[in-house]
C-alpha cells in the first residue's frame, strides 16, 4: 500500500556527511526532572523517542517517562488488528538509546555506528499488531571501517539489534574504482552473510527502501502496486494488467496529507508523485517473451492520464520489481524476478508469542515452531513446508543467468518507465552464490554496474544467515512436515472476540499490510 513504509520499512543514511550535521551532545540536567506522559499511539511512541533525543542535543531537564496510558500487553488493537505489545518494547528502546547518549561527553558528536545502533533499537520497538517489526537498510560511507565490520564476529550476541538492518556501502558510480569494488567484494564473500551490501548511486544524498527497488531522494517513500505476470496469455492481457496497476498506483500517489510528518515529506512526495508498478512471477518465463518496453509505455501513459484527472504531477519514476515475498505466497507464484527456491523447501514466518496461533501450534504441533533467535522471549518462527509446482524454474540456474534476467528487465521495463531523477528504480533480487562462483559474479557486477542500484547476495547454502526466510529441505522432510501441517485444525484457534475495524484505517496508512523480513 502507499504508506506502509512510513512506519514499518525504513531506509536511512549514516554516511559521514549526513551524521556530521547532527548537533553536539548537551546532556540534560539529571538534578531536574520533567514528566512525559507517553500517548498510546504510534505518534505517542515516536514523540517519546524524539523528546529523549532532543534532551541530549539541547540540554534541559532529564525526561521521566510515564507509561501509564499505554494499553497492557495482549489488549486488542481495534484498527490494525492483533494484540498490543504493552509498554515493555518502548521501555527497552528508551533505556538503550539513553545508554548510547549517556556514553558521550558534552561537546562530542555521535559516530555513524552509534546512530545506526540507535535506529536499530528503535526498529526493535516497532510492532504492527504485536507481530511484525521494522525492516531497515542502512547506507554508510565507503571509508567507514566501523560500519563495514559492524556484523563481524559474534555480533548477534553482543549487538543483536543490528539484525534489524541490512547494511550497504553507498558508492558513487562515477567515482568508485575497480580495485576498491573488488576488495569490498572479497570482504562480502568472507562475511558468509552477504554483508556489507553495495548500493550504487549517481547522487550522494539519494537512498532507497530496504528491498532496494525504489530510488528515493531524501524525505520520500514507496508507493507500490503489483502485477501477477506468471500467467499472462498475450501482450494485450499484459498491458491491461499493468494499466490497471498504474491507475491504482496513481490514485495512491494523491494521498499526501501525512499529518504527523514534517511538511518536507509532503512537498517531496507531491513533487515526484512516485509510483512503483511491479511484476511478480517473472520466473515463469511468460512475460520475458512479451514486449516489456511497450508495457512500460502503457504504465506511463495511464499514470499521466490519471494524474491529470487528479490534478497531481505525473510520476517521476514508474516501473520497478519488488521482492514480492507476501504477494507471491498469496498468488502461488515465484517471487518477483526469482525462480522458485527449490523443489522442496521451508518458508519461515514470524509470529508474536502472544498470538493464539502460536499457543495452538506450540501445544499440538511443536515441530512446526521454534523460538526466534534474536527475540526468543516474545517472538517465534513457524516453518511451513513448500513444494514448487511441476515444471517450475528452480534456483539451480546459475547466478549469471539470474543476473542477466535482472539486466534485461532493468533495460526493458524499468529504464523505459523512468521520467526523471538521479537514479532509476531497480530490480530487487537476491543472488545465491556457490563457493566457486564468487569471482565471476563480482566481475559481472562491476562490468554491469550501470544496470542496477543494489543487489542482495548470499552464499547458496544460506551461509551464516540465521533463520533465513527460505531453507532447502529433502522430500522426506517435506513429507514429514506436511503430515503435521495436514493435522492443523485452524478452527480450534479461537479468538474470544475480534474488534478489528479496518474502517478506522485511513486510506493510505497501510496498517493491515504485513512486512515479511527475516
Regions found by a protein language model. Name each.
Residues 1, 42-53, 126, 130-133, ...:
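Conserved phosphate/anionic-ligand binding catalytic regions in large, soluble enzymes, centered on
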Residues 2-7:
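Short, small-residue-biased leader/transition segments that mark boundaries at the very start
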Residues 32-34, 66, 71-109, 237, ...:
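A structural-propensity feature for long, helix-poor, extended segments
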Residues 33-37, 41-53, 88-125, 184-187, ...:
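Alpha/propeptide regions of enzymes that mature by internal proteolysis
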Residues 62-64, 104-117, 126-138, 254-270, ...:
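Flexible, glycine/charged-enriched surface loops at secondary-structure junctions
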Residues 131-175, 256-266, 279-323:
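Internal maturation/activation junctions in enzymes
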Residues 188-191, 197-261, 271, 323, ...:
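Catalytic alpha/beta core of large soluble enzyme barrels
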Residues 500-518:
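Short acidic, low-complexity intrinsically disordered linear motifs used
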Amino acid at each position: 500500500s502507499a504508506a506502509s513504509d512510513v512506519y514499518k520499512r525504513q531506509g536511512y543514511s549514516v554516511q559521514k556527511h549526513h551524521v556530521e550535521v547532527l548537533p553536539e551532545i548537551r546532556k540534560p540536567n539529571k538534578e531536574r526532572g520533567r514528566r512525559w506522559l507517553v500517548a498510546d499511539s504510534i505518534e505517542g511512541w515516536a514523540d517519546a523517542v524524539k523528546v529523549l533525543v532532543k534532551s541530549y542535543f539541547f540540554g534541559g531537564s532529564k525526561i521521566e517517562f510515564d507509561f501509564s496510558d499505554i494499553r497492557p500487553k495482549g489488549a486488542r488493537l481495534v484498527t490494525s488488528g492483533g494484540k498490543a505489545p504493552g509498554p515493555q518494547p518502548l521501555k527497552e528502546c528508551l533505556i538503550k538509546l539513553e545508554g548510547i547518549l549517556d556514553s558521550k561527553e558534552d561537546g562530542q558528536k555521535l559516530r555513524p555506528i552509534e546512530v545506526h545502533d540507535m535506529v536499530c533499537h528503535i526498529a526493535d520497538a516497532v510492532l504492527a499488531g504485536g507481530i511484525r517489526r521494522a525492516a531497515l537498510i542502512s547506507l554508510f560511507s565507503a571509508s567507514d571501517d566501523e560500519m563495514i565490520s559492524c556484523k563481524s564476529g559474534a555480533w548477534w550476541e553482543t549487538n543483536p539489534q543490528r539484525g534489524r538492518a541490512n547494511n550497504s556501502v553507498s558508492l558513487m558510480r562515477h567515482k568508485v574504482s575497480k580495485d576498491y569494488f573488488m576488495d569490498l567484494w572479497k570482504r562480502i564473500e568472507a562475511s558468509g552473510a552477504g554483508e556489507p551490501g553495495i548500493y550504487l548511486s549517481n547522487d550522494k544524498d539519494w537512498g532507497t527502501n530496504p528491498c532496494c527497488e525504489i530510488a528515493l531522494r531524501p524525505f520520500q517513500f514507496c508507493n507500490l502496486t503489483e502485477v501477477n505476470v506468471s500467467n499472462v496469455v498475450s501482450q494485450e492481457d499484459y498491458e491491461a494488467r499493468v494499466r490497471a496497476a498504474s491507475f491504482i498506483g496513481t490514485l495512491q500517489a494523491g494521498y499526501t496529507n501525512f499529518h504527523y510528518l514534517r511538511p518536507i515529506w509532503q512537498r517531496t512526495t507531491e513533487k515526484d508523485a512516485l509510483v512503483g508498478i511491479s511484476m511478480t512471477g517473472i520466473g515463469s518465463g511468460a512475460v520475458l517473451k512479451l514486449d516489456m518496453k511497450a508495457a512500460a509505455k502503457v504504465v506511463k501513459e495511464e499514470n499521466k492520464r490519471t494524474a491529470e484527472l487528479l490534478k497531481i504531477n505525473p510520476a517521476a519514476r514508474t516501473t520497478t520489481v519488488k521482492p514480492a515475498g507476501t504477494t507471491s505466497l498469496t498468488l502461488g507464484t515465484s517471487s518477483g524476478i526469482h525462480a522458485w527456491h527449490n523443489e522442496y523447501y521451508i518458508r519461515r514466518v514470524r509470529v508474536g508469542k502472544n498470538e493464539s496461533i502460536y499457543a495452538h501450534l506450540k501445544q499440538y504441533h511443536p515441530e512446526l515452531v521454534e523460538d526466534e533467535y534474536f527475540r526468543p522471549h516474545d517472538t517465534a518462527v513457524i516453518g511451513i513446508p513448500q513444494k514448487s509446482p511441476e515444471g517450475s524454474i528452480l534456483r539451480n540456474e546459475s547466478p549469471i543467468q539470474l543476473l542477466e534476467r535482472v539486466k534485461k528487465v532493468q533495460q526493458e521495463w524499468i529504464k523505459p518507465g523512468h521520467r526523471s531523477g538521479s537514479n532509476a528504480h531497480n530490480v530487487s533480487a537476491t543472488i545465491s552464490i556457490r563457493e566457486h562462483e564468487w569471482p565471476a559474479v563480482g566481475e559481472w557486477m562491476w562490468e554491469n554496474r550501470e544496470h542496477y542500484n543494489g543487489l542482495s547476495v548470499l552464499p547458496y547454502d544460506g551461509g551464516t544467515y540465521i533463520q533465513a526466510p527460505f531453507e532447502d529441505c529433502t522430500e522426506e522432510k517435506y513429507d514429514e512436515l506436511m503430515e503435521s501441517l495436514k493435522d492443523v485444525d485452524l478452527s480450534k484457534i479461537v479468538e474470544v472476540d475480534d474488534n478489528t475495524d479496518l474502517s478506522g484505517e485511513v486510506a493510505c496508512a497501510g496498517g493491515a499490510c504485513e512486512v515479511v523480513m527475516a
